[in-house]
Amino acid sequence: MSRRSKYLKRILWGLLLTPIVLVLLVSLLLYVPPVQNFVVHRLASYLSEQTGMQITLDRIHLAFPLDLSVEGLDVVRAPGDTLLSVGELSLSPSLRPLLDKQIEVPHITLDRFALNYTDSTGLSTVRARLPKASVEELYVDLEKERVDLSRLVTRGGSVSYTSTDTTKKEDDSEPLRWLIRTGEVDLQSTRIDVAMPLDSLFIGADVTRLRLDRGEADLEKMRFQIARARIEGRELSYAVDRTPPRTPYFDPSHIHLRDIYLEGESIDSEGMRLSLLLSRAQFNERSGLKLHHLSGRYEMDSLGMCLDDFLDTDGSSMQGALTMPWSVLRSDPKAGIELTMKASLGTRDLLLLSYSALDDLPEGKKLLTAITRRQLLAPIRLSLETHGTLSALELSEADLHWPDVVRLSLKGHLTSLLDEHRRSGRLRLTGQVGAKAQTLLSLVSPELARDYMIPSPMTLSGEVDIRRGVYKGDLKAVEGSGRVALKGHF
């Protein structure tokens, strides 16, 4: 081979290898700290020009092969208005999967994260603060749109959302098709606040710990599944305005729960469909109402709901099952209903829950005080079993027992419940009046108590016949050797 051919061959090889060498050289230079600092400042300046915001980045450190850490990232929209701040972000993605459009990161740590976002209308704001978070074994497949996450842990932090916007958003964008799977999510010491004054909604939560095991989110179907969830919280509040509660009793417009514990399993939600097994729930309400235990299975979809649960408070307990379609709420006469319930309702709990209604009555407060003073606080026991439809309902059992006051039992059937002109049926009634019935009458209606005396003990029996909206009663009252027949209609 001639000298000229060798010379041309060297030039050709040089031309071919030069881009590769340059790429390798630039790659190697990126591991040199002075070069990294130069790139950081150039990148921050470029992004600031493109976004119109001031972006500063203190330091980027890249170690072989891809150990990356970012420190001191700040995105400022205007002086004193910081949109985003990151104290430190560290991650080490694997190199080989990147060539296949996949991201594998064994470990990610995030320190001192802050977000302060206001939408373009200035009516909605989101503020978030996260002192520390870590992610383990993150896998992202960009082509299949799938995310797998072994573990996510956060410590401390707060999230607040405020909105005075009532316009309905129309979203014509394509739905997200990402599938996200998580092994364990552990959020510790988190504060959540939501304020929507124009919607009369104010929510605050101080969550000690929220743990989710084996979760899956299909964003295309909007289906969310969680194998197990546990929530521990110091407090949870709901209100319709910012004013303090008017009464020390239970106020449904100002609910404040403390010492909260919730545990559920097999949670599955998609649209109107929801099913879950509530293993345990307990809390204390500001009014003094204490829920010691609540458990059961809940299922609902677009057609109806099914509940099977047990409840226990300081003075009450309840166990039962309910199955009904949503069409019952639309007065569908063919809607089937099944209900069984056994309950012991503490009078104190009933007073706490009904205080707001009694407080509006002229003698409401006096009645509450008198019931307590006259020792009428024995639990009221209820037993109910019914099935059928709104056009034909069978009442298998309906018992009420208020010790020393009254005991009543009803059985029978009803038809055309929704039409007062066609409503018909027959109910059999038995009961007994106790020694404190007269005391209760004197509290509810002192005028009647002065004119009438309720004998005790007195038994009741008879029937109520309903035909086309006309009620006819045929009852007998017996006290010792005395008998009274009561007949009437309306």
Protein language model features and the residues they cover:
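Flexible beta-edge/linker motif
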Residues: R59-T164, S173-L201, D206-T208, D213-M272, ...
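Beta-propeller and related beta-repeat scaffolds in trafficking/envelope systems
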Residues: L123-A128, T167-L176, S200, A205, ...
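Outer-membrane beta-barrel pore domains and translocons
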Residues: R155, D312, S344-G346, D399-H401, ...
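Outer-membrane beta-barrel proteins
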Residues: D58, D81, T125, G264-S266, ...
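Feature captures outer-membrane beta-barrel proteins of Gram-negative bacteria and organelles
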Residues: L294-Y298, G412-S416, K487-F490
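Solvent-exposed loop/turn segments connecting transmembrane beta-strands
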Residues: D81, N284-K290, T313-Q319, W402-L408, ...
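N-terminal type II signal-anchor transmembrane helix
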Residues: M1-G52
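Transmembrane beta-strand segments that form the barrel wall of outer-membrane beta-barrel proteins
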Residues: T190, L276-A281, L303-F310, L393-L400, ...
